[in-house]
UniProtKB/Swiss-Prot annotation:
This is Homoserine kinase. One of its GO terms (molecular function) is homoserine kinase activity. Pathway: Amino-acid biosynthesis; L-threonine biosynthesis; L-threonine from L-aspartate: step 4/5. It is an enzyme of class 2 (transferase). Its EC number is 2.7.1.39. Its main location: cytoplasm. Belongs to the GHMP kinase family. Homoserine kinase subfamily.
């Protein structure tokens, strides 16, 4: 049996639109068993999720290795679908990794990242999911350029997952068609300074900049009303660092372990319609183990 584990991811981290992301300790697991005459995909997603060759993971694997022998596979995931936690990226990477192993292609991480980004269109989820930790990345249509970001050792991610889905296409359609040159410069400067602050270990600056996005959050605010609610609540506790995870609707607040309990207690008492999780960064990324 081959076991492939891929972490959830939170993209953008505020102003790092389509370029910054972090892996979180919430996982999709793919178990690959015996060869079969046709692909068999066992999962608990319900009847709307294909259980044969039309499954997204299998289709992704066949894009990389079209002649791949069918197998029986089992998919388990704690990553909710269409919530802004990289569920599609984790599934995509699981499919590519399965093809890489079964077809003995021996692609390294750079090659896998290039394949994944070409399929996904941007690297902010697939890069941290593959490599672990927090990553800044850029794709020019041919190559993926990436570098790690530093996170405080005691950082926690208070994660509110609303009880409704938000498709990426809907969230993308909410974005402005263009920005003025002046606004683009300002938005880019905020993202650049956030990256520098994180790598300098200046979390006091970083957490302020996390809330100063000018690329997407304002345009998507009506799709994720809990962003303002949670941010305002955190501010009342003098906690700064709340942002919309990926395309939303999940909302994340970066906090120290000391502040995590305080904010989590208040948010729990608010009984928001969704799930609250206290997550830590995943620093290992995609993992593959083989058991005879």
């Amino acid at each position: 049996m081959i076991k492939i584990t891929v972490p959830a991811t939170s993209a953008n981290i505020g102003p790092g639109f389509d370029s910054l992301g972090v892996a979180l300790k919430l996982y999709l697991t793919l178990e690959v068993y015996e060869e079969t005459s046709e692909w068999q995909v066992i999962h608990d997603y319900g009847a709307n999720m294909p259980s044969d060759v039309n499954n997204f993971i299998v289709k992704t694997a066949l894009l990389l290795a079209p002649n791949l022998t069918p197998h029986r596979i089992v998919v388990k995931s704690d990553i909710p679908l269409a919530r802004g936690l990289g569920s599609s990226s984790s599934a995509l990477l699981a499919g590519l990794a399965m093809a890489n192993v079964l077809a003995d292609m021996r692609l390294n991480n750079d090659a896998l990242l290039k394949q994944a980004t070409a399929l996904e269109g941007h690297p902010d989820n697939v890069a941290p999911a593959l490599l672990g930790g927090s990553v800044a990345a850029f794709y020019d249509g041919e190559q993926v350029y990436h570098a790690p970001l530093s996170l405080p050792k005691d950082i926690n991610f208070i994660t509110f997952i609303p009880n409704y889905e938000l498709l990426t296409t809907e969230a993308r359609n909410a974005l402005p068609a263009k920005m003025t040159f002046k606004d683009s410069v300002a938005a880019s400067a905020i993202s650049n300074t956030l990256t520098a602050a994180l790598n300098a270990g200046d979390f006091n600056t970083a957490r302020v900049l996390i809330e100063k996005d000018q690329f997407h959050e304002q345009a998507r605010a009506h799709l994720a009303p809990h962003l303002k609610i949670i941010r305002d609540t955190a501010h009342q506790l003098e906690i700064i660092g709340t942002y919309l995870s990926g395309a939303g609707p999940t909302v994340i607040t970066l906090v120290s372990k000391d502040n995590a309990t305080k904010l989590l207690k208040v948010l729990t008492n608010m009984a928001l319609p969704g799930k609250l999780l206290l997550l830590e960064p995943d620093y290992t990324g995609l993992q593959i183990t083989k058991n005879n």
